[in-house]
Amino acid sequence: DGGRHLITFHPRGPGLSSAQVRDADWLDFYMNQSSHAARDLDTGLYVEHDRALTPRRPVIDGEPRYEGIPVGFYNEGHDPRLRFDDDDARQAAWWAVLAGAAGHTYGNNNVWQMWAPGRDPAIGANRPWSDAIDDPGARQMGLLRRFMEAQDFATLEPRQDLILDGPRH
């Protein structure tokens, strides 16, 4: 391919690559990190923001709520027993994609760190990655993919106003 690869910038969360490197010639697509701060954060708002910018670029949420990670783990006084689950992962994905994201990143706390018994866990890893890789949220991303691939992408338009549940309703 002549060394031509897609390049983006992974912002600290919550954050937007467009806030830091929006006009960079090397930036091929905008990435946001909607973060692990709390449940029901509307990931679609990040996508809507970047889709309205110029230069126009595809948008992806590169780090949404990871399945199995403690909710708000970096917030003082968080409860380490409260974890994001498959519903949280699914919600983040659908909200972003229906807002016009070019794709979505699924994350699992135990998988990203390849945690296994006998290894020091980071951010509350508590299940072997080899088990967590089959968590419900991972399987549900396949349903989202199949649904979106069955659509005619050229005719799709973001319609957040049709979502009747969530922070804005």
Label for each model-derived stretch:
Residues 11-15, 35-37:
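Short beta->alpha connector loops
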Residues 15-24:
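Distinct, well-ordered alpha-helical segments
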Residues 3-4, 24-118:
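Catalytic-core region of carbohydrate-active enzymes that cleave or remodel glycosidic bonds
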Residues 6-8:
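Substrate-access "cap/lid" subdomains that shape
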Residues 58, 67-69, 85-169:
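Aromatic- and carboxylate-lined catalytic core of secreted/periplasmic carbohydrate-active enzymes
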